[in-house]
Amino acid sequence: VRRVWADGRELDLTTLVVRVHRGDETQPPDPLIVAKEGADNAPAYRGLAYVVFERLPLESFGNRVPQFSFEVARPVDGLAAMIRAVCLIPGASEFGHETSPVMQAFGFGVTRPENRHQLTAAADVVASLDALQALCPNLRRVSLVVSWFGDDLRAGHCTVAPRVESAVKVTQGAEWSAAGLTRASARIVSQAGGAAAYGGTPSDASVVRLIRHLKDRGLEVVLYPFVMMDVAGDNAMPDPWTGAPGQPAYPWRGRITCDPAPGRVGTVDASAAAATQIEAFFGTAAAGDFAVASGAVSYSGPAEWSFRRHILHYAHLVQAAGGVDGFIIGSELVGLTRVRSAAGIYPAVAQLCTLAADLRAVLGPATKIAYAADWTEYGAHVRDGGAEVRFPLDPLWSHAAIDAVGIDFYPPIADWRDGADHADLAEARSPHDLDYLRARVAGGEAFDWYYASEADRQAQTRTPIADGAYAKPWVFRAKDLVGWWSSPHIERVGGLETATTAWSPRAKPIWLTEIGVPAVDKGANGPNVFPDPKSSESAIPPFSGGSRDDLIQSAPSKRSCPVSTPCWRAIRPAQTRSRLFTARR
C-alpha cells in the first residue's frame, strides 16, 4: 500500500499511525485490537489483507469514518524479480539525496518543498526506495551517483567542481555545502530555456546521510562519482574535435580530449604535449591533502578543481559515512583514455592507475574499486585499419587496486526497421521477439558485422567482422565480452603481434556498471541514446519513431504476453555462459 485517500483527499501518511497487514496465513492479530478487545476477541484475519489506522482524527472528516481508497502495488514476474542492483539518479540535485524534508523559504511564511513532492514519506528519496524495495524484492545493491561539473572539452582547460542551481536560495532543514564550498562561493550551473540546465551537486551532508540510510535498509552501496558537462550552447570555446569556435552544448564527458583532438591535423596526440594536457585535467591533489572531522571533509592541497580532487574528495566523504561496499573511480572517459603521449603509451590510464592506488590506501581492503568504461572503450584500440592494436586499459584492469572490470554496457541489440523488406524480418516477426534479442546480445552489430558508413546503415549493407591475420575476431568485437575476458591480449604493430599485455584471462569479474534500454520505439536499436532538447547529444534510436514502448524495456503481465522483459531475459542467458559477470542489473 503506497498512497491512501480519505473522501477523495490524499492523506499525509507521515502524520498518521498506519499498519498494513498483508493477508498471509501466519499474520498475528493487530496489537491495538488485541489491547482493546482482548486476545480471545481479536481475529487475525489470516488470508485477508487489511489496514489499521490508529487514532485517526475523525473530526477532520465530520466525526465519521471516511471513505478510503488505496493504491496497491505488487511485483510481477519478470524484470522486477531479476533486478539485484540499480543506479540511483539523478546525481545532480542539491537536496535530492536528503532523507529528511528541506524547504525553500521565500519570506513572510512562504515555503516550497525542495525534496518532498509526495505524502508517503518524509523525503522523495525515501519514498522512492520504499517503492523500489517493495517492487524489487531481490534488490541487493545501489550505485549512488553524485555529480560534479566539467566546463571544457579541452583536457588542459577543463575544471571539475561542485555547482549550485542558484547563488541566492534560503533553505530550512539543511544548508547546501560541498567540498568546502557554500552556496555563495560555488559556481552556478548555466541556464537553458530560462531555467537551470542541471540540478546542483548534492550537498555533502545529504550524501553521507543517504549512504547511512541505504545501509540501514540492508543494501550494499557503491558510490559513483560522475562528471556532467556544463557547457552552455552560447559558449565560444574552441572545439578540440573540429577547431571551430563554440563547443557542442552540454556534451558527453567521453568527448573530453587533448587539443587538437586525435585525428585532426596538428593533433598533439602521441606527443608530450598530450601528456601535459592530461596531467592538467587530473591535477595534483593528493590523498594527504584531505581530512575528515565531524562528518565533513576538508582540503588543504593545491588550489585546483581537478578530477583527482573530485574523486579523492568522495573517497574521504564515504569514510565519514562509515564506508561503502564499492567505489567507481571514473566512467566513460574514452576521449582521454585513448590519447597517447607516444606510440602505445596512454597517460590517462597511468593517471587512473595512480588514482586507484591512492583510493585503495584511503578506502582500505574491504571496498571494491572499479573503473566504469564505455562499452566502446574497455577493449582494443584499433588504428590504421587494424594494423595497430593496443589494449589501453589493460594496465588498469590488471592493477592490484582494481577489483573488477566495469563496463557501461549500451551496445545496439537490434536493427529493426519499419516495413516488410528489412533484413531482420528473416530472424523475427517482432522487435520484441525473445530469441531474436537473445541472439543479438552476443551477435549482430558490433559482433558479427558492422556498418562502415551511414549510407551502409540505411541500406543494411553489413561488413563482416573478421580477423584474417590471427583468427581472433573478438579483438574487433565490442560485444564479445566473453572472448575479450577469457583470452590473452597480444598487441599488434604493423599488422604483427608483439607483446602480451598484463591482463590475465578470467582474472577479474566484469561489472555491468550501467545497462538499460529506453522505453521507446525500437529502443534496442540504440540503448545508448536519449532525448535531451538542450544537449548536442540528444537523439532517439536509429529508425525509431519516438513513440513510447514499455514492452521493449520492462515486463508486461504474463496474461498479455507469455514472454516477459524481452531485452533483459535475453541478456541473462548470455551472461551465464561463463563466470565472468558479477550481476549488477
Give, region by region, the residue ranges found by the protein language model.
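Well-ordered, non-membrane alpha-helical segments in soluble/globular domains
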Residues: 118-129, 200-208, 304-313, 346-357, ...
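Substrate-binding cleft and catalytic face of glycoside hydrolase catalytic domains
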Residues: 84-106, 140-344, 368, 374-375
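Short amphipathic alpha-helices and their capping/turn segments at secondary-structure boundaries
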Residues: 74-79, 126-140, 207-217, 312-321, ...
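Short linear interaction motifs
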Residues: 1, 109-137, 190-207, 308-309, ...
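Polar, S/T/G-rich
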Residues: 1-97, 111-114
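Structured segments of extracytoplasmic/periplasmic soluble domains
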Residues: 7, 89, 131-135, 145, ...
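Aromatic-rich peripheral "rim/lid" segments of glycoside hydrolase catalytic domains that contact
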Residues: 522-585
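Noncatalytic carbohydrate-binding groove/subsite architecture in carbohydrate-active enzymes
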Residues: 279, 283-531
